[in-house]
């Protein structure tokens, strides 16, 4: 019994070490790439009052994916909070869809972003698979809007894969509510599989 407890504690520590490393890499890359995209496309300096909306997936009564030890809604909020801190230190004005463990309706998220007149919308998620074999990072955008959505998705995805050496699941199109109903370039990033042993 005691041996099993020690094994579980060691596994929990490995999980948290990996997640912290992944969080750090993804957060830094997200912040840098979002900033670069905004400066390039909107011809502004980093000191302009520019709204970037970060959407930490799930929250409150909607936990998202989990592997028993780690819950998606907690990971996405951690990534979003750290990304916000880096961007704000660089002079950007950042808005969060949620700042704590609260539930926000899916249809309300793009409404919040549009109300803020944001320049970029980034929705952050973690993936899962029933068989535990799914792995890698994938990024989504919608074709219903302009080319800026695709360019933002491709830039963020390319650099995250390059720096993390994670399995590349590609840049894909999807008509998710938060992508279609936002009025600014928007992407949804699946940052890794909580159900895959080496990614969690």
Task: Go through each PLM region and give its residues.
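N-terminal Lys/Arg-rich, disordered targeting/topogenic segments
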Residues: 1-18
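Hydrophobic membrane-insertion alpha-helices, especially the h-region
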Residues: 20-37
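Conserved beta-strand segments of alpha/beta enzyme cores
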Residues: 93-95, 138, 167-170, 185
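Active-site-adjacent mobile loop/cap segments within catalytic or ligand-binding domains
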Residues: 123-131, 170-200
